[in-house]
């Protein structure tokens, strides 16, 4: 991720963006043939729940496509990421959360998702990809480790709950309420003199342990 993400006091948007120049340097040094895929987390938990911009997703996609490298998202909090894009990235204010999520995934070859975050369920997850050959390989492995490809060891009840949760989480009112709850807590902590990671992310408030001590 970009260097600015490591400065907990810097309050700027999209601190989860990948440094594309560093990524290109890494590809040139290691060789594209030695890189299985690039993983882009949306949002970035490591940096305090910071979002990734559409502009950065496009830039990463263009670079990796040039080298024949796949891009997979850690999409566990992708709907939160879409909310931040709508709120902060020029040109997206009038777009629906759902349409922004769809555009985000148009720049990826696949993604992993935990059901316990933006899907609003207590269990499960899933893996998606647009490469049929890769899908067939994954399909063979899931039988060995999890269950049949159609359910992966999950109960039908949980898969249905996950589908409903995804639909409900894209409602702007819900996501706005959730993000602003985190901001409310963060602002209260700041007012009390507690150092936190800024800007406040979508799902949690992270303490700045170095300054806190």
Where do the model's predicted regions map?
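Cationic-aromatic interfacial patches
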Residues: 200
């Amino acid at each position: 991720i970009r260097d600015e993400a490591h400065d907990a006091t810097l309050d700027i948007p999209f601190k989860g963006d990948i440094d594309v120049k560093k990524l290109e340097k890494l590809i040139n040094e290691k060789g594209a043939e030695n890189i299985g895929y690039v993983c882009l987390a949306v949002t970035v938990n490591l940096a305090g729940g910071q979002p990734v911009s559409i502009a950065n997703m496009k830039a990463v996609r263009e670079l990796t496509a040039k080298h024949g490298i796949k891009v997979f998202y850690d999409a566990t909090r992708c709907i939160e990421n879409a909310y931040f894009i709508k709120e902060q990235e020029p040109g997206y204010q009038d777009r629906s959360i759902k349409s922004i999520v769809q555009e985000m995934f148009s720049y990826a070859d696949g993604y992993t998702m935990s059901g316990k975050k933006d899907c609003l369920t207590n269990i499960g997850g899933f893996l998606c990809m647009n490469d049929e050959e890769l899908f067939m390989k994954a399909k063979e492995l899931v039988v060995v480790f999890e269950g049949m490809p159609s359910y992966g060891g999950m109960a039908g009840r949980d898969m249905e709950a996950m589908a409903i949760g995804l639909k409900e989480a894209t409602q702007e009112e819900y996501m706005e309420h959730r993000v602003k709850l985190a901001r409310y807590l963060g602002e209260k902590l700041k007012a009390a003199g507690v150092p936190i990671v800024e800007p406040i992310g979508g799902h949690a408030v992270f303490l700045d342990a170095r300054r806190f001590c």
